[in-house]
């Protein structure tokens, strides 16, 4: 492609996003779809917001949520997250559990939630891993677990 003047040499059929999505488990697809759309909208709004300071409340909420999403995706080098933790964190974001946590505290909150799930909710994580999709039972357990974590989390 590069030698044919197509620069950058990106083949849509081999694109990482297309191949990556095909390799994801259904649970990841269930929570990631909405997040992808929100991130795209956030990037558009963030670019637009640079030119104007008078933003309505809805736009401000979208920008805040987008900032939280970006922070949630940050992780230290050589510290991969298991697929079941990724699903749980994205589900928590999608279901507004991070909305009242400041952007600066999102990293701490996500690490705290991950520790909570890994040390006390192994059965739930195993269900996500083995069923590979979010059904009503898993969503109910996620809601219960994340609500319990949220009641104890202190964003100091």
Each language-model region and where it sits:
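Conserved catalytic/coupling modules of large nucleotide/cofactor-utilizing molecular machines
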Residues: 1-156
């Amino acid at each position: 492609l590069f030698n044919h003047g197509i620069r950058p040499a990106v083949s849509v059929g081999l694109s990482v996003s297309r191949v990556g999505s095909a390799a994801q488990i259904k649970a990841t697809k269930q929570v990631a779809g909405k997040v992808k759309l929100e991130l795209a909208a956030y990037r558009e709004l963030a670019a637009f917001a640079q030119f104007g300071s008078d933003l309505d409340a809805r736009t401000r909420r979208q920008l805040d949520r987008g900032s939280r999403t970006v922070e949630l995706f940050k992780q230290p080098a050589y510290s991969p997250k298991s697929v079941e933790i990724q699903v749980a964190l994205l589900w928590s974001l999608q279901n507004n559990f991070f909305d009242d946590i400041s952007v600066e505290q999102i990293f701490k909150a996500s690490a705290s939630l991950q520790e909570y799930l890994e040390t006390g909710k192994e059965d739930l994580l195993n269900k996500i891993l083995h069923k590979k999709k979010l059904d009503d039972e898993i969503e109910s357990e996620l809601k219960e677990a994340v609500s319990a974590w949220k009641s104890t989390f202190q964003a100091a």
